[in-house]
């Protein structure tokens, strides 16, 4: 492929509006262009990478018996009314009307559409399981699209759906998808973790996310590729390393997910679902007499603890939430934070919201800083399981400026149930006891769900089972953010190339270091002077030879300065660059391996073998 025939509009500088390195490099290297806020055009290079990702997915899904189809993006609202999501999905849903004033949506996901297709065609358990998927655009009206392809209004997604007559069949397909996802992300070269996740608005029971880790900003060696005349990172002057660290610090760590994993163990979960080992305290502590004390001006846990000269561990804080139409009081250890997802899941609520200060004062006669569980009536009280173990606790007295000392569950107040409601902290023990918990940031690149009958029951997607009974099909759904994957790959494979000039000066620049299986082309042939007849003849000869060996080759046939060509080649990030320069008449070329920075000068007859050896 001739570079002059392709649309690769590289930029000399990073775009000023980019906040994460993946967005900046995709724009600067000419992979994408923004058409509107949150909407991007995938230019030829990006499209080639996406096609390679799609083909990897197709190969792995073929292995598990998943069949590809293509559903429309413009969907009737009637199906979403059947499932109940038309009015509950929220403002992210694109709603529109046709000329007949009928309601339609642009699909953010396709559970309803697929279920309607299946219910019209399958009526017996004998035709199940069915496992289908598509790779197609999705739409969400993001209030604040940002971070390039990571949070857009239109995005490319692989969404799969499976239908089953029994739980064993659903479990088997769910596990097949988990293994297929792991193979896909491994082939993409990603550092990722499968984690326990919340099903959220999708509904259903079991759920697992796949997160690409993005928060490594400390390990400089991971980011740097050194030129052949730099032997180690220690050779780089401290002033240059400081500049590199400053450059790294300009870019936000991509990914809005915090994951929790066990260092030295297998446990991993989203922060919303993570728990730690809970060991009941069996030691006996004498219950002291309840005492009401003045705490003037002390409204926070920190202020109360300091005023009473106690540890925060000895306090219980009281929170108030609306859960659908019910008011709920939640008790936590004073130095813990409430995990709202755990609270939502425990209550089975579709909506929770913290009560306002005014509501609390009207209902309980005190502000939050003095609120406590003693004397509360006609309200549900639930507590984190740690609260049960706090003997002689300090709690609010439901009178502003006062607290109780020595409050004890069972004697002074009651709790409907003790459950895990807190957000875990780093350094705690994994729930399985194997390893301590660590936090990391990452990008969600895949998500699988066991939806059960969440959609099939609502939409009357029933079959006759082996006994002739009409039952709703069981359902699973399985998503991969394909365009997100492109950003995740760049977040992990962006590199800073450091070179030492003949004048012993150190320079550095950003480069993309695509994994071999995903690079838009395998090899970049760069003739330095397109007016040099010998160089162009050798370029054509090498292109033909390399293509004959199965390599995908991009030839920079532009009449540009050598510096421009090399800068663009570094930005584009193909695994191998072959430079045809002044020694073309002698049949000598220069080979540069992107991943290692290694550069060798070889005879043209050694090119294929050299590339195979150096690329391993």
Curated annotation (Swiss-Prot):
Entry's Gene Ontology molecular function annotations: aminoacyl-tRNA deacylase activity; ATP binding; catalytic activity, acting on a protein; proline-tRNA ligase activity; transferase activity
EC number: 6.1.1.15
SUPFAM superfamilies assigned to the protein according to its UniProt record, in alphabetical order: Class II aaRS ABD-related (SSF52954), Class II aaRS and biotin synthetases (SSF55681), YbaK/ProRS associated domain (SSF55826)
Coiled-coil positions: none
Family from the record: Belongs to the class-II aminoacyl-tRNA synthetase family. ProS type 1 subfamily.
Name of the protein: Proline--tRNA ligase
Domain of life: Bacteria
Keyword Cell inner membrane (UniProt): no
Domain notes: Consists of three domains: the N-terminal catalytic domain, the editing domain and the C-terminal anticodon-binding domain.
NCBIfam families, per database record: PRK09194.1, proS_fam_II
Transferase is among the record's keywords: no
Purpose of the protein: Catalyzes the attachment of proline to tRNA(Pro) in a two-step reaction: proline is first activated by ATP to form Pro-AMP and then transferred to the acceptor end of tRNA(Pro). As ProRS can inadvertently accommodate and process non-cognate amino acids such as alanine and cysteine, to avoid such errors it has two additional distinct editing activities against alanine. One activity is designated as 'pretransfer' editing and involves the tRNA(Pro)-independent hydrolysis of activated Ala-AMP.
Catalytically driven reaction(s): tRNA(Pro) + L-proline + ATP = L-prolyl-tRNA(Pro) + AMP + diphosphate
Subcellular localization, as worded in the UniProt entry: Cytoplasm
Quaternary structure note: Homodimer.
GO biological process, one term: prolyl-tRNA aminoacylation
Chief location: cytoplasm
Alphabetic keyword roster: Aminoacyl-tRNA synthetase, ATP-binding, Cytoplasm, Ligase, Nucleotide-binding, Protein biosynthesis
Classification via Pfam families: HGTP_anticodon (PF03129), tRNA-synt_2b (PF00587), tRNA_edit (PF04073)
Lineage: Bacteria, Bacillati, Bacillota, Bacilli, Lactobacillales
Family matches, as InterPro entries: aa-tRNA-synt_IIb, aa-tRNA-synth_II, aa-tRNA-synth_II/BPL/LPL, Anticodon-bd, Anticodon-bd_dom_sf, Pro-tRNA-ligase_IIa, Pro-tRNA-synth_IIa_bac-type, Pro-tRNA-Synthase_IIa_type1
Any single Gene Ontology cellular-component annotation: cytosol
Enzyme class: ligase
